[in-house]
C-alpha cells in the first residue's frame, strides 16, 4: 500500500484517498472467488432446488408446512 498524505482543494487531509491494491485470485487457487468456486456454488444450488421440488411432489405439500406439521 502506498504511503503519503493526500489533501483536497481546501487543504483538508483525505484519509480515504489511497485505496489498497486489488488482487485477483488465480485460477488454480483453492479458495476465494474464482470460476471453479462459482460453478460449484451454482451447481449445488441447482441440485438443492431440484431436491426441494421433488420433495414437494413426493409429500404433496411444501417443505415448510410438512416440517411445521411434524413439530406439532
Swiss-Prot record:
Induction: Transcription is highly up-regulated 15 minutes after a shift to high light (500 umol photons/m(2)/s), declines by 2 hours to low levels. Upon a shift to low light (50 umol photons/m(2)/s) transcripts are rapidly degraded. Also transcribed in response to blue and UV-A light. One of its GO terms (cellular component) is photosystem II. SUPFAM superfamilies: Chlorophyll a-b binding protein (SSF103511). GO terms for molecular function: pigment binding. Its main location: membrane. It comes from the Bacteria. Keywords: Membrane, Photosynthesis, Photosystem II, Pigment, Stress response, Thylakoid, Transmembrane, Transmembrane helix. The chain crosses the membrane at residues 47-67. It is a single-pass membrane protein. It is found in: Cellular thylakoid membrane. One of its GO terms (biological process) is photosynthesis. Forms homodimers that associate with PSII assembly intermediates containing CP47 (psbB). Belongs to the Hlip family. A high light-inducible protein involved in photosystem II (PSII) assembly and/or repair under stress. Binds chlorophyll and carotenoids, protecting against photo-oxidation during PSII assembly. This is High light-inducible protein HliA. It comes from Synechococcus elongatus (strain ATCC 33912 / PCC 7942 / FACHB-805) (Anacystis nidulans R2). The gene is hliA.
